[in-house]
Amino acid sequence: MIRLACIQIAPVFLDAKKTWEKLKEKIVEVKSNGAELVTWGETLIPGYPQWISPSGGAKFNNPQQKKAYAKYWQEALHLEESKIIEDMKTVAKKHKLMFMGGIIGAPSKN
């Protein structure tokens, strides 16, 4: 049987690096309690695009939403080049853990 830990934390909104650092602290904590598989919520990194619902849905020509989406996309993790993804791999290997969690991914910049 695998021991699962589900981490429920608030992100450092639209800051992927700070959210990962916060999450990493919790990962080390749950590992010390015997976790083998660690999961976390949808789009934790860099945060859920909460501006969609209160603003009446996705309005892509709205200047405020364009600005918010630009920041959201900027904070997405480029899967092949992300230092955060590399650190996730390092942490998982070091602590002999499996991760299954929500991130916003982006294609390679190259």
Question: Model segments located where?
Answer:
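Extreme N-terminal starter segment of soluble prokaryotic enzymes
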Residues: 1-6
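Cys-nucleophile CN-hydrolase/nitrilase-fold catalytic domain and related Cys-dependent amidase chemistry
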Residues: 16, 28-110
